Amino acid sequence: VILHGDGTREYKVIGALAEAVKAQSSDPAHWNRLKEIFTSKSLQMVSFTITEKGYALQKADGTWFPFVEADIKNGPDKATGAMAVLVAMLYERYKAGRYPIALVSMDNCSQNGAKLRESVLTMTEEWKKVGFVDEGFVNYVSDEKIVAFPWTMIDKITPRPSEQIAADLENLGIENMQPVITSKKTYIAPF
């Protein structure tokens, strides 16, 4: 919905989702499709919104989380955690042509790109230690001219959704447009 200064409105449907793929090595069809996507030279960016905890590989005492320990032991073909799945896909990309890519954390935490990079490099190094990947792959992932980890800042300050716009959209035949009140008493809407 575009609100013009003269009070008129313009409506456009913006479709940003083309496909959904499970990032599970236990599902061969989805896993192979994910590999196909990651090995495509046209893929330029992968974004993440997995919360700061999604990048964590170790508990507070410095030991690996059990799923991370399993990922290190089992390697790229049986990756389960988010960072292991990402590194497994980067390994496929490396083998396919060492194509550049930007890995963009959109999580609202300080130095989000650095946190993502640290986790990716840690998993990469651990897999190198046990022989799943080679030094060339470590160099590929470490070179920020090829695999970039930019820092981002997310601004979620948005105006309260208009109930009138929701009604107008529903009158146009678009369903479920009413704003929702969250547990934190903020308002969100699908428009």
Task: Identify what each model region corresponds to.
Residues 1-191:
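Substrate/ligand-engaging "lid" and interaction regions
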